[in-house]
Amino acid sequence: NILDKKMMANRQSNSYQRMMEHYDDLLTGRKWWSRIYMRFIWNEDTNLLARKVLDLIPDDFRGRLLDVPVGTAIFTAEKYRRMKDAEIVGLDYSEEMIAIAALRKETEEIANLSLEQGDVGELPYANEIFDCVLSMNGFQAFPEKEKAFAEIFRVLKPGGCFCGCFYVKGERRLADLFVKKVMERKGFFHPPYDTFAEAESRLRSMYGDDVLTEKMASVCLFRCVKPQRESTENEQ
């Protein structure tokens, strides 16, 4: 029985390894077909985009960081190994993604990363507990985007940083068509989506003037700082 359990665990590990490699090939453009997909459909370099997003967080960051959705941690693993003074929580709704990320955490020895399955629309955390929230290519997949934005704002400390990127409509007709005909039908994307202008307006309405945005093909890259609470007369 012990041998059977070990064999089953090995098969499961090998299965997740194959899934991780295929998924990562698609995202990173390691294969010719994935490079065609990223260039022809999206007209973007996901590796460059990921580097630009992660550069918004310093390697010497100290504090608690929430990564939602963590995905397979393909783009963040190397960064997190350098962030030795950070306490990082990776959350994803998909148990498969969590399993793949756990395999990467183990094989690449990312000691400061903990992984949890959960819903961004109902984050299982107290108010104002994170110093930074990272969300890379997540919002197009969130069914309840308003709740996701509100929950991230709730768990972020005043003065904390919210950064990442997500798909915006109206920038590239081929990408918009692919989203509607393929990604939505497969359940990978969930409407509605903001235009770039709408995304910028939304972020400014929540975070005020301390908002930076950049358009990269059909993606909005952003960095926001949550305003400090205004002190009351009793606190002064």
Language model features with spans:
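C-terminal lobe and adjacent flexible extensions of AdoMet/dcAdoMet transferase-like proteins
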Residues: F222-Q236
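Conserved class I S-adenosyl-L-methionine
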Residues: L3-D59, I74-E78, K180
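A short acidic, Gly/Pro-enriched loop at the edge of an enzyme's catalytic core
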Residues: G121-V133
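A short SAM/SAH-binding and catalytic strip from SAM-dependent methyltransferases
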Residues: C132-E144
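C-terminal alpha-helical "lid/dimerization" subdomain adjacent to the S-adenosyl-L-methionine
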Residues: M38, N43, C163-F222
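Class I SAM-dependent methyltransferase SAM/SAH-binding core
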Residues: R64-E122
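A generic alpha-to-beta junction signature in SAM-dependent methyltransferases
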Residues: I57-D59, R82-M83, L156
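A short glycine-rich, Lys/Arg-flanked "PGG" loop and its adjoining helix->strand segment in the class I
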Residues: E146-P158
